[in-house]
Each structure stands twice: as structure tokens, then as C-alpha cells.
């Protein structure tokens, strides 16, 4: 009876904790992520007295969590393929019962850790590249669904806290049709997903001024609540639920101590914390669990400093006159950060990247500990994006070593910038490692009931041995998990630690490197994470008192182990662990050597998270602006140009609109805003400067069967159609280019090299923005031409692609696979942009447009019609013809693949010869007189204006960036100055002392073109002469054929060079693989040798033990033999006695027989004996007759 009651109690308690904590074990073994549908939220005002279900019910019971098959779910150009088979999900493991012993799971943990280590050691071949998040949005039927963002007016993308769904690493996409939740496998994967989707919705985020809102909030504790109840809070921002705390039992106070952080928030008005009491399901009368709320105006906690206060709880039914009501202590900070376009931070980022050491030395004495932490965080994030973080940490650490001198014990014991920087870097790149190494161990410890208190003043003497055994067991397990985690140790940290070891050796102090590594990793990362798992995102819940004490003791032992120190008289009650410490020192030394050995750098991917570089630069600027103002003038003068740079950025911040780059205003505000109209700034410029007649729709060569569709639109670089909202993707077998070089930020395309494009209007939109689709703009503008009475500005028209070209996958690129060309902002291969900006032209125009990742889509008929219309001299007629069929035009891909007048090479699939475009056409005949200011549209289409000199259009083509750059999008087809193009360069633009913006450059170029046009109007030949020139062009077909063959030869030569380069790269890759496999083989041999040595040591120990056992057995045998001999003597004496007794017995039997015979004879004779004979036994065993005595 009692056993059954106990079992029911155990089951009830387990389910109680399961319902309370709602932390189902994460399925990290999942081969995919899954999508979920969020139910509609319920605002706190709409809720009745009863609270909604606790976290976890959503993911366990709601039937609407999986996407409906009837709902279309499509991402444009994104996950557009089906996977070949369904991917099964591993089952969720049940939570460990709280009253189960932690000791029971120790063998499982040990075997799992050993198996993981052995498995990792056995992997001599490189791992397969695991599937990225672009393959992880799967429905249960394994069909890929899509979410169409192209037609949405407003899309909200935000992370979902784990307390809402009971699942970590989720995010939500909210559109007009509803919201979808998606689950990822890690925080880094979730951040990359969210950023890619945000860039799909707002492609020009880095090129525009934006504002970001950040909230950090601690729900600490509550007081004046009824005892013996459990309480929890819900956090709502503007009446939208964002997170929940765990339920905590009331003792003195209800202590939660939980931290929440939210980024990319909309502007907030109020922060509301709702207080609930957990209801007991057994008591049906307890229905009203809602206790009240605390409302914080966002303005009251705005600023850089945290605000911590006790806030009264406003209850629904206040009871006056009965003392103070409940109160909650909350600590919060709400920040609004203004972020300028990336171009505005370029000089600032370059200065920080190159002069961080002097800056830190100047600011170290005046900064507070909190400011040092914030500044170190911003510096680490920025330098991680620029690839300089290893040098930064190494330089700071060596300066710290020089400062401390012989006082090695002071290193990492003070709040310096170096200490804070390594802390932030460990948190940045080591979060996943921390989860893999200690996550399961900490969770199991939370769920166990082992008591590890070993202080005699806090526990009884009878329980002390058991508690000491518990603590030793937990420490063994924790250290086992740590030393076996070397196989998943982050590659970046290994590189940093290896650099420290190398620098210490070069300074003649190799002994201090081990202290640096152990102190940084254990003192500043692992041990604090063990003591406070909630602060390191291992768990949300703050531990209870017993668990907190256990974690503190484990951290003490681990830290002493890392310091190679024993417990002394200060903590004498821990001295029983000294034997464990001494035993594990060797393993600790091996672990520290392993994680700092440059020869064992693994093939694993580097940091995969996303860094918002604009936000970090804005934060660092505000910190430096405040700090530099406090410095003395003598110190400020040593900072070089930094004060001026800070002033420039501050001026841009304080001037609304000054940070907006030309041509980027509201490009992504609505899907069609940039497509339906041209830039207001350009319209104003056209009106004021009377330039509308100068924008020319030019037909380059005479129409032939091969080149009759070659047109281009000259358009201002300040105008850019709004890109269609689409989502970026990458193939599963494509290298992860976005995170090359240690995970550069997507917005660092223009900040990683000092020789970036001079005078460009903005930084590139990023590596993941898909090609712009401008058909809608073309259709609307072409349709509007006939209705205009004045000449039409065609700047908003989309550029026209050659016939037979259409977007395709990046894998079809003619250049290096997977390495898209770097595009300047607003260029889209527009020749006008290239000429106006004075930029070196990319050689991408020399080959097929497939080098940009495009194949073809025919716009043949449109181009043919436009050519015919231009030939007839009536451009407006062609416009009217196209206006009648805008749908057909909109369906065709329109883009320009030839860069700015660079020699156009015919397509390889051309059916016949073509005249080269770079050959100057014959001089045109003089046009009829026309007003200077305006040119009619029909005149624009009939006149054959001479093109600018080849020095402007077809200048030499150096690389976009320098050889030392680490840009992810650097083109492999650009190899310096092209020898074929140099002879054609007539002149080059000289360097301008002032770098105008793109709009001014375009205006200047148009004015220049106007002057050339007017000069040619007065000097051109007459129309009959033009006809004769055309007949000469028709007779020069042989020259055209020769030009075509020369172009093909040049293309073949270029391809040959590319193939040679590719072959060299492949050869280098093969050599690297051979060296890597050789290193792995040597590592395997070394590992086998170490294993053999360990086995030899074990065998020697076993043999010595057997010999000692044999000696003990011999001694025992001798003792037993002596005992046997003594027993044998006793047995012999007993045998003799038994023999004598047998003889006496035989005589007795014979005497009895005689007596019997004697009595029987007397009875037959009738004589009765008067005196019966008495027999007596003598001493020697014989019988004696008593009558004879």
C-alpha cells in the first residue's frame, strides 16, 4: 500500500515539475528545423480572470501548430525545390524526475562523453558539410512551402522567446495573412535566417538611415504576496506578449532573477509585467489566478543607464486599508539607437580597425567598469566583422602582460579593457560550445536532488560523507564533460590561444601562456557559466538555493583545478578534494595544450552568427563621443583624426536627412514605390538644369540579324528602381560565402579594404540581395510616354538586357563558382553610372552575361520593334506601340549586361558576325535646327550622336579591390589591368580634389554630353552623306567578321587564363588536402602511440597487482596448510579412539550373545537362577562377573 502511494507521489511530482518548468528537452539531433503556426495573441485586457495555458501547452496540444496543407506558403526564389525524402525527427526525451538521484545518470553521462570522444577521435576523414538553415523550413509531409513577401506592405520578423513556445531558437514572420513560427537549431542559425529575411524585405537597409529600439529587462523579485504559492510573470510590450518567467515558490520573497533582451523592436510606449499565481488543478474553486500588473512607460526607462525600482502591482480589485499591496522589483533600460548608412561609418571603421591599441591605452584610465564592458563589446563585434579580432585580443593581452610584469596573479583579476574584451569574445564565439559542453550537465543538475553541501557548519556530521561523495561525483562528471569538449572547441578561440602562446614564447615567457589561457577560459567563462547558467543563456530559470550551492562548489573545484592549486586552510572543509585535483592536473594540462595547439585546428566552420555592424558602430561612436570629451587636450591630440571623424558622424546624426545617401530614400518603403516614379531629387535637378532632353535612348550599331536588339538606356546613377521583395538563398552544396573569413558581417562589403570605390553614393547592398527586377518600372514608364507633352525623362526606365538572357542559379556563373561579382551601389551594370562615377570598369562585360549568374530570356521582339522605330525616326511611335502591350513588356527580363560602353562581345551562340560596338560610327549628318534647351523626343530617336571617347567608356579595367582585401564578393575573373583593353584607352579621368556624390556626377556628365551633342549638331554631315556612309557600313562586312573573330579569340584567351587559374587553385587545394590528411594521419599515429603507452602503463599496473595478489595467496596457503596439519593430528587420534571403541563393542556383543544362550538353556531345563549374575565393564572395556568377586 505504501509502495503504491510512493509511486503515485513520485509520478505526480514529476509531472508537476514538468508542467511547471515547461522545458521539454531540445531535439538537437533533428536533421531539420520545423515550422509552426502561432495562434492569435490575446491581449491582457481581453483575458478573463483565468490565465492562459502555461508554456509548453502550445507545442504539445495545439492542433494548429503545423501548417495547413490548404494554405499556400511560398518564398519567391527561395526553397523552391522538394526534398527527396522525409526527414524523421527524434522523439523528445522525458524530463528527469526531481527526486531521482543524480548518481543514477552518472554512468550514462560518462559513457556518452567517452563515446563522443572516441567517435571524434576516430574521424580521420573530413566531415560532410551539414545542411544549412535554408533547407530547414519543412512541413511534416516534407514538401517545401513558401512565404510570399513580395506583395506585403508590412512584414514583421522577430525572435520568439523560448518561454512562449517551449522551444528554443524560434522566430516569427508576421504578414497580412497571419504569422508563422520557425524553429532553428541554434541561435546563430536563427539570427542568420532573420537577417536574410529582413534584407529580402528591406534590401537597402545598410544604405539608409534607420532607428533601432532595444530593451533589456530583469524581473528580479516580488514581495508582500501570500506564502506557499507559486507565482510567475508575463512580459508584454505594447500589449503584445513577448516572454514569461518560470514559476517560483514564495519564501521570504518570490525571487525570479530572470533576464530578457529584445532587439529590433518597434517604437514602444509601455512595458507591462502581468503577475499570475499558478493555479492548483486539484482545487476547482481557484479560478482567478490573475493578480495584477505593473506598467512602465518606455520613456521612464529610456537612456544609457539602467533603472531599478520597486513598482507597485495594480490589482483588479484593490482592497484599501489593509497594508501595502504586492510590489515587483524590475531593472530595465530602453535604448533608441540611430544608425547612419554604412558609407558614413567607413572612415570611422577603418580608423578603429587600424588604431585600436592607442585608443584603448588613452581611454583606459577614465572609463568606468560598465563603460569598459560596453566599449569592449562594441570593439569585439566590429573587429570580428573586419577580421582583426585575433590581432586585437593578442595585442591587448600582451600589453596586459607587460603592465602586470612579474605579478602574474593579477592577470584577469582586474576590470580592464583587455579582460572585458576577452569576456565578450568568449560569449560571442563560445555560446554554442558552452551549450555543447555543459548544457546537458547543468540541466541534469537542476533536475536532481543531490545534496552536495560539505561545510560542517551547514550540515550534520552523519550526512557529511554522503555529501562529499555527491560533490566528488559531480565534479568528476563536470570535468569529464569539459576535457572531452576539445573536439568541439571553437576554431577562432584556438587561433587566439595559439597566438597568445606564440607571442609569450617570442617574449621569452612561455610559462605564462598556460596561465593566460586557463584564466581566460575558466575564470572568465566556464566557471561563471557554471555558477550562473541563466546569465549565459544555458537555462532561463535562476537556480534554487540548493542547486546554486552545488553549482558554486563545482565552480570552486573547477577553478582550483584550472589554477593548479589545492584547497588550504581558508577552505579546509574542501581539502578532501585535493586528491582529485592532483589526479586531474595532468589531464588539465593536456586539455590546455590541445585547445592552443595550432597544428590541431579543426575543419569546423567558424563563427556563424550575425553581427549588426551598423548598430555596433553607432554604439561605439556614442561611447567614444562621450569619453573623448572628458579627455585632456594633450591626450586628444595624440588620437590623430579620430576627434574629427567623431564630429563628422555626430554632425550627420544630428542633422535629419543628412545621413541618407542619394538615391536611397524610401527605396523599400512599398513594393512599387521606386518602380512607379523616378527620384524626386533627380526630377528637381532635371527641371532646374533643363536636362530632360539630354537623356537619350540610343541605338548603338546598325541593326543586323545578330545585334539588332542591342540598346541601352542612359540613366542617372541617382535613380534606382525599387528591388522586388524576394528572399536570398544558397544551394546545399554551395560554400558558405556569407561567413567566409571568420564570419564577416553582411554589411562590411565596403569597409574591409582601404581602396574602396572612390566617391560612390553608398555601400553595396550586401551579398545576398538577388538581381533587381525592373519590368514593372519599364512597363509603367513606357506606357506613360505618349501622354507627355514635354520630353520624357527616361531615368526611371529599367535597363535593357540583350536578347536571350535571364536570371538563373548562381552555380552557372562563368567566373569562379559561388563568388558573385561585387556591384557598386545603384549601378546594376549601368554604363551611365560607371562613366559618371569614374569607376574602373569590371571585366564582366567581356564574357557572357552568365558571369553575373544570368542566362537568357528573350526580349527580341521588343528590341526589334524599338530598333525599327528608331530607324524610322519616330521614337514616340515605338513608345505608343509598346504602350499598347505593357503586359508583354513586363514579362520580359530587361537588364543591361554591357558595362558603360566597354567593348561589347557578341554572344557565343550568335548566328552570324557583328560589328564591334567600340568601333566609332561614321559622323552623323547635321540635324535640323532645334532650340538649345530642349530637344524633341522624335529628334532624340532620329539623330545618331557620336559616343564619348573610348577613354571614358572603355578604359583599362583594374580590379575593384586590392589584393589584400577579404571581400566575400571579390570577382575571380578580374586579374588586374587587361592587356587587351589598354591600347583602346584614349584618356583617363584625372583624380578630382573633391568627390561629388552620384547625383552631381550624373548631372555633370549629362551637361558634358549636351555640349558634345551641340558641337556635333553644327559639324555633322548632311543626310545624303549619311546614306553613303551606311552603304559603306554594309560593304565592311569582312571587317566585322574579322572583329568578331578577334573578340572570340580574346574570349578564348581569357577563358584559357581562367582555366589555368582554376587548375592552379585546384592543385593548391589538392596539396592542402594531402597535407591535411598527412597531418591527420600523423595525429592518428600520435594518438595511437599515446593510447599504446596508456595501455602499457595499465598492463604494468595490472601485472604488479597480480604479483601482489599472488604473494598474498601464497601466505594464505601456508597458513591454511598449518591449520590442516593440526586438524589431521586430531583426526588420527580420533580414529584410534574409534577403533578401540569398535573392539569394545564387539566384545560386548559377544558377551550379550553368551548371556542370551545361557538364559535360554536354563529356561529349557526349568531351573530359575536365584542369584542373577551381574556384569560390570572394567576400565579396559572387558566384562566382569560380579558373583565371582
Swiss-Prot record:
One of its GO terms (biological process) is positive regulation of apoptotic process. The record marks 172-173 as: Breakpoint for translocation to form KMT2A/MLL1-DAB2IP. InterPro entries: C2_dom, C2_domain_sf, DAB2P_C, PH-like_dom_sf, PH_domain, Ras_GTPase, RasGAP_CS, RasGAP_dom. Residues 193-311 form the C2 domain. Residues 919-931 have a biased composition (Pro residues). One of its GO terms (molecular function) is protein kinase binding. It comes from the Eukaryota. Residues 101-202 form the PH domain. It holds the Pfam family C2. Residues 1026-1159 form a coiled coil. Its main location: cytoplasm. Residues 653-668, 715-731, 938-955, 966-976 have a biased composition (Polar residues). The record marks 413 as: Arginine finger. Residues 20-38 have a biased composition (Basic residues). Residues 1-75, 653-678, 715-742, 803-823, 843-865, 895-998, 1015-1035, 1164-1189 are annotated as: Disordered. Gene3D superfamilies: C2 domain, GTPase Activation - p120gap, domain 1, Pleckstrin-homology domain (PH domain)/Phosphotyrosine-binding domain (PTB). The C2 and Ras-GAP domains constitutively bind to MAP3K5 and facilitate the release of 14-3-3 proteins from MAP3K5. The PH and Ras-GAP domains, but not the NPXY motif, are crucial for its cell membrane localization and neuronal migration function. The PH domain is necessary but not sufficient to activate the JNK signaling pathway through ERN1. Exists in a closed inactive form by an intramolecular interaction between the N- and the C-terminal domains. The proline-rich motif is critical both for PI3K-AKT activity inhibition and MAP3K5 activation. Functions as a scaffold protein implicated in the regulation of a large spectrum of both general and specialized signaling pathways. Involved in several processes such as innate immune response, inflammation and cell growth inhibition, apoptosis, cell survival, angiogenesis, cell migration and maturation. Also plays a role in cell cycle checkpoint control; reduces G1 phase cyclin levels resulting in G0/G1 cell cycle arrest. Mediates signal transduction by receptor-mediated inflammatory signals, such as the tumor necrosis factor (TNF), interferon (IFN) or lipopolysaccharide (LPS). On plasma membrane, exists in an inactive form complexed with TNFR1; in response to TNF-alpha, dissociates from TNFR1 complex, translocates to cytoplasm and forms part of an intracellular signaling complex comprising TRADD, RIPK1, TRAF2 and MAP3K5. Interacts with DAB1. Interacts (via NPXY motif) with DAB2 (via PID domain). Interacts (via PH domain) with ERN1. Part of a cytoplasmic complex made of HIPK1, DAB2IP and MAP3K5 in response to TNF-alpha; this complex formation promotes MAP3K5-JNK activation and subsequent apoptosis. This is Disabled homolog 2-interacting protein. It comes from Homo sapiens (Human).
Amino acid at each position: 500500500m505504501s509502495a503504491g502511494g510512493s509511486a503515485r507521489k513520485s509520478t505526480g511530482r514529476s509531472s508537476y515539475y514538468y508542467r511547471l518548468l515547461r522545458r521539454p528537452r531540445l531535439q538537437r539531433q533533428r536533421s531539420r528545423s520545423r515550422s509552426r503556426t502561432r495562434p492569435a495573441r490575446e491581449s491582457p485586457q481581453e483575458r478573463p480572470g483565468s490565465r492562459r495555458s502555461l508554456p509548453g501547452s502550445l507545442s504539445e496540444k495545439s492542433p494548429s501548430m503545423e501548417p495547413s496543407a490548404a494554405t499556400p506558403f511560398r518564398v519567391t526564389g527561395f526553397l523552391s525545390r522538394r526534398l527527396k525524402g522525409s526527414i524523421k525527427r527524434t522523439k523528445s526525451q522525458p524530463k528527469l524526475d526531481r527526486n531521482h538521484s543524480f548518481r543514477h545518470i552518472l554512468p550514462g553521462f560518462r559513457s556518452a562523453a567517452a563515446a563522443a570522444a572516441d567517435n571524434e577521435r576516430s574521424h580521420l576523414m573530413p566531415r560532410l558539410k551539414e545542411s544549412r538553415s535554408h533547407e530547414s523550413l519543412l512541413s511534416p509531409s516534407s514538401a517545401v512551402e513558401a512565404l510570399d513577401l513580395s506583395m506585403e506592405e508590412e512584414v514583421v520578423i522577430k525572435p520568439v522567446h523560448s518561454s512562449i513556445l517551449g522551444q528554443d531558437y524560434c522566430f516569427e514572420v508576421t504578414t497580412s495573412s497571419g504569422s508563422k513560427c520557425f524553429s532553428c537549431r541554434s541561435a546563430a542559425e536563427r539570427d542568420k535566417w532573420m537577417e536574410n529575411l529582413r534584407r529580402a524585405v528591406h534590401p537597402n537597409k545598410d544604405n539608409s538611415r534607420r532607428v533601432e529600439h532595444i530593451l533589456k529587462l530583469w524581473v528580479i523579485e516580488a514581495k508582500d504576496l501570500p506564502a506557499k504559492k507559486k507565482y510567475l510573470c508575463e512580459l508584454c510590450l505594447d500589449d503584445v506578449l513577448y516572454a514569461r518567467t518560470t514559476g517560483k515558490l514564495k519564501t521570504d520573497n518570490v525571487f525570479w532573477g530572470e533576464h530578457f533582451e529584445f532587439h529590433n523592436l518597434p517604437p514602444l510606449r509601455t512595458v507591462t509585467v502581468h503577475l499570475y499565481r499558478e493555479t492548483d488543478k486539484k482545487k476547482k474553486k481557484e479560478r482567478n489566478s490573475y493578480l495584477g500588473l505593473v506598467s512602465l512607460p518606455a520613456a521612464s526607462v529610456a537612456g544609457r543607464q539602467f533603472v531599478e525600482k520597486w513598482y507597485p502591482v495594480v490589482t483588479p480589485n484593490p482592497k484599501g486599508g489593509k497594508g501595502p499591496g504586492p510590489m515587483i522589483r524590475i531593472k530595465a533600460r530602453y535604448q533608441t539607437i540611430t544608425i547612419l548608412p554604412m558609407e558614413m561609418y567607413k572612415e570611422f571603421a577603418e580608423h578603429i580597425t587600424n588604431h585600436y591599441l592607442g585608443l584603448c591605452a588613452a581611454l583606459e584610465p577614465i572609463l568606468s567598469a560598465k563603460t569598459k564592458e560596453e566599449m569592449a563589446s562594441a570593439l569585439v563585434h566590429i573587429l570580428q566583422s573586419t577580421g582583426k579580432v585575433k590581432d586585437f585580443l593578442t595585442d591587448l593581452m600582451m600589453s596586459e602582460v607587460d603592465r602586470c610584469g612579474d605579478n602574474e596573479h593579477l592577470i584577469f583579476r582586474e576590470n580592464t579593457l583587455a579582460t572585458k574584451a576577452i569576456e565578450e569574445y568568449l560569449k560571442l564565439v563560445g555560446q554554442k560550445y558552452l551549450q555543447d559542453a555543459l548544457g546537458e550537465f547543468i540541466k541534469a543538475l537542476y533536475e536532481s536532488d543531490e545534496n552536495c553541501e560539505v561545510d560542517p557548519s551547514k550540515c550534520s556530521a552523519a550526512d557529511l560523507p554522503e555529501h562529499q561523495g555527491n560533490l566528488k561525483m559531480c565534479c568528476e562528471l563536470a570535468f569529464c564533460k569539459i576535457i572531452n569538449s576539445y573536439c568541439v572547441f571553437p576554431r577562432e578561440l584556438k587561433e587566439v590561444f595559439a597566438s597568445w602562446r606564440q607571442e609569450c614564447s617570442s617574449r621569452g615567457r612561455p610559462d605564462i601562456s598556460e596561465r593566460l589561457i586557463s584564466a581566460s577560459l575558466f575564470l572568465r567563462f566556464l566557471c561563471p557559466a557554471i555558477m550562473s547558467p541563466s546569465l549565459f543563456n544555458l537555462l532561463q530559470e535562476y537556480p534554487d538555493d540548493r542547486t546554486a550551492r552545488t553549482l558554486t562548489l563545482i565552480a570552486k573545484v573547477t577553478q582550483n583545478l584550472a589554477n593548479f592549486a589545492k584547497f588550504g586552510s581558508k577552505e579546509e572543509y574542501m581539502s578532501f578534494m585535493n586528491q582529485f585535483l592532483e589526479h586531474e592536473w595532468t589531464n588539465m594540462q593536456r586539455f590546455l595544450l590541445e585547445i592552443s595547439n595550432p597544428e590541431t585546428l579543426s575543419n569546423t566552420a567558424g563563427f556563424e552568427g550575425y553581427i549588426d555592424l551598423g548598430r555596433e558602430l553607432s554604439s561605439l561612436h556614442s561611447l567614444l563621443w562621450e569619453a573623448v570629451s572628458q579627455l585632456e587636450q594633450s591626450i586628444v591630440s595624440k588620437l590623430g583624426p579620430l576627434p574629427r571623424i567623431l564630429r563628422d558622424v555626430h554632425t550627420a546624426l544630428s542633422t535629419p536627412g543628412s545621413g541618407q545617401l542619394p538615391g536611397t530614400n524610401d527605396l523599400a518603403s512599398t513594393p512599387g514605390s521606386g518602380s512607379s516614379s523616378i527620384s524626386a531629387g533627380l526630377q528637381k535637378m532635371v527641371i532646374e538644369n533643363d536636362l530632360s532632353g539630354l537623356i537619350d535612348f540610343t541605338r548603338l550599331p546598325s541593326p543586323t540579324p545578330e545585334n539588332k536588339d542591342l540598346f541601352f538606356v542612359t540613366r542617372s546613377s541617382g535613380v534606382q528602381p525599387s528591388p522586388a521583395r524576394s528572399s536570398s538563398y544558397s544551394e546545399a552544396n554551395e560554400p558558405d560565402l556569407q561567413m567566409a573569413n571568420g564570419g564577416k558581417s553582411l554589411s562590411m562589403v565596403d569597409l574591409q579594404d582601404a581602396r574602396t570605390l572612390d566617391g560612390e553614393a553608398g555601400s553595396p547592398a550586401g551579398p545576398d540581395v538577388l538581381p533587381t527586377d525592373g519590368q514593372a518600372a519599364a512597363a509603367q514608364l513606357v506606357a506613360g510616354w505618349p501622354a507627355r507633352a514635354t520630353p520624357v525623362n527616361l531615368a526611371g526606365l529599367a535597363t535593357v538586357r540583350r536578347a536571350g538572357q535571364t536570371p538563373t542559379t548562381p552555380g552557372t556563373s562563368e567566373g569562379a563558382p559561388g563568388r558573385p561579382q561585387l556591384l557598386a551601389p545603384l549601378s546594376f551594370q549601368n554604363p551611365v553610372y560607371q562613366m559618371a562615377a569614374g569607376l574602373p570598369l569590371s571585366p564582366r562585360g567581356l564574357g557572357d552575361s552568365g558571369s553575373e549568374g544570368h542566362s537568357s530570356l528573350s526580349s527580341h521582339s521588343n528590341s526589334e520593334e524599338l530598333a525599327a522605330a528608331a530607324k524610322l525616326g519616330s521614337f514616340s511611335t515605338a513608345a505608343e506601340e509598346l504602350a499598347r502591350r505593357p503586359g508583354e513588356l513586363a514579362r520580359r527580363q530587361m537588364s543591361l549586361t554591357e558595362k558603360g560602353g566597354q567593348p561589347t562581345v557578341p554572344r557565343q551562340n550568335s548566328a552570324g558576325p557583328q560589328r564591334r560596338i567600340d568601333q566609332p560610327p561614321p559622323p552623323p549628318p547635321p540635324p535640323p535646327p532645334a532650340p538649345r534647351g530642349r530637344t524633341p523626343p522624335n529628334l532624340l530617336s532620329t539623330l545618331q550622336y557620336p559616343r564619348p571617347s573610348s577613354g571614358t567608356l572603355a578604359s583599362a579595367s583594374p580590379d575593384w579591390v586590392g589584393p589584400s582585401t577579404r571581400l566575400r564578393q571579390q570577382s575571380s575573373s578580374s586579374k588586374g589591368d587587361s592587356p587587351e583593353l589598354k591600347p583602346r584607352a584614349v584618356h583617363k579621368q584625372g583624380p578630382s580634389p573633391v568627390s561629388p556624390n552620384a547625383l552631381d556626377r550624373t548631372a555633370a556628365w549629362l551637361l558634358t554630353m549636351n555640349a558634345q551633342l551641340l558641337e556635333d549638331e553644327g559639324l555633322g554631315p548632311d543626310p545624303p552623306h549619311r546614306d553613303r556612309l551606311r552603304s559603306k557600313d554594309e560593304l565592311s562586312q569582312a571587317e566585322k567578321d574579322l572583329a568578331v573573330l578577334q573578340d572570340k579569340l580574346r574570349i578564348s584567351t581569357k577563358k584559357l587564363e581562367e582555366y589555368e587559374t582554376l587548375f592552379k587553385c585546384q592543385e593548391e587545394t589538392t596539396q592542402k588536402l594531402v597535407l591535411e590528411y598527412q597531418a591527420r594521419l600523423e595525429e592518428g599515429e600520435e594518438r595511437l602511440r599515446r593510447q599504446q603507452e596508456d595501455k602499457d602503463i595499465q598492463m604494468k599496473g595490472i601485472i604488479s597487482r597480480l604479483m601482489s595478489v599472488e604473494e598474498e595467496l601464497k601466505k594464505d596457503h601456508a597458513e591454511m596448510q598449518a591449520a590442516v596439519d593440526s586438524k589431521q593430528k586430531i583426526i588420527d587420534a580420533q580414529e584410534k579412539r574409534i577403533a578401540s571403541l569398535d573392539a569394545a563393542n564387539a566384545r560386548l556383543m559377544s558377551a550379550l550373545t553368551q548371556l542370551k544362550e545361557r538364559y535360554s538353556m536354563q529356561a529349557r531345563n526349568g531351573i530359575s537362577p536365584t542369584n542373577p549374575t551381574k556384569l560390570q565393564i572394567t576400565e579396559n572395556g572387558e566384562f566382569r562377573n560380579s558373583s565371582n568377586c
